[in-house]
Amino acid sequence: MRTAVSIFVVSAMALGSIIGGATAAPTPSASASAGPQKKVTSSLIKRPSGTLAPGSTVPASEIFGNRVFIDANRGYALVQHGQAQYPAATTDGGKTWKTNGPALHLNAAQAPLAVAFIGAGGKKKIFAWGGGQVIDATPDGGAHWYRATFTGLPVAVLKNPKGHLVAFVDGQTGASSVATQYVSKDGGKHWHLDNTVGGS
C-alpha cells in the first residue's frame, strides 16, 4: 500500500505576493528563549455579523489560491467575498460553490489571521493556513471551524498516514529559522508539540 502526500511549503516572504502584498508581522507572544509552545488549543470560530451564512452560493470567480478535490465531485477552496474570506465547498465537480463555514478572515481587522491555502485530510477534515499565525480547521466537514494561533508562522499542513493533522510552524528565530512540528489527533481542535518523524 502506498500513501501519497502533498505538501505546500511557503516562505513568509512569498505569502506577501500571494495574498496581495498585505502580510502582517507576527505578534510576538513569547520570547525566542522561551522555546516553542508545547500545546495549542483552538477556539471555535463564530460567524461575524454582516457576513455570509454557511451554505451561501458564491461564484467560482471569487476563489483564490488552490482548490482541493477529495473525489471527482467533492472539493474545497477559499473565496474572497466582499471584505471576508470563507471556506467553500462543491459537490458537483466545481460547477457551483457554497460557503462551508463562517468567515475565516476579515481583511482589515484580522491581518495576522489571514489564510491563503486550503487542504483536506479526507471527507471531514479540512484545514486552511498561510499568511498569518493561524491554522483554521474543521473536524466535521464544515459544521464547526476552529482557530489555532501559534507564536510562529505555519508553513505547511498535511495529514499523516494515521489520519492526524501535522503542521510545521516556523519559529522565526532570526536568519536561520527552525520549523517546529505539531500534531492534532482531533481534526485541529488541539495541537501538541511532536518531534517524531511524521508525527505520532
Model regions: which residues?
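Short glycine/acidic-enriched loop and turn motifs that connect beta-strands
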Residues: H81-A84, Q172-A175
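Repeated scaffold domains used in trafficking and secretory/extracellular systems
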Residues: E62-R67, A108-I118, G152-N160, G199-S200
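Beta-strand-rich domains and repeat architectures in extracellular enzymes and scaffolds
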Residues: G55-G82
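C-terminal region of N-terminal signal peptides and the immediate post-cleavage residues
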Residues: L15-P36
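N-terminal export and membrane-targeting signals
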Residues: M1-V10
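Trp- and S/T/G-rich repeat-edge/linker motifs of beta-rich repeat architectures
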Residues: G35-A60, K95-L106, A143-T151, K189-G199
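Conserved Ser/Thr-centered positions that define the repeating blades of beta-propeller domains
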Residues: T90-T91, T138-P139, S184-K185
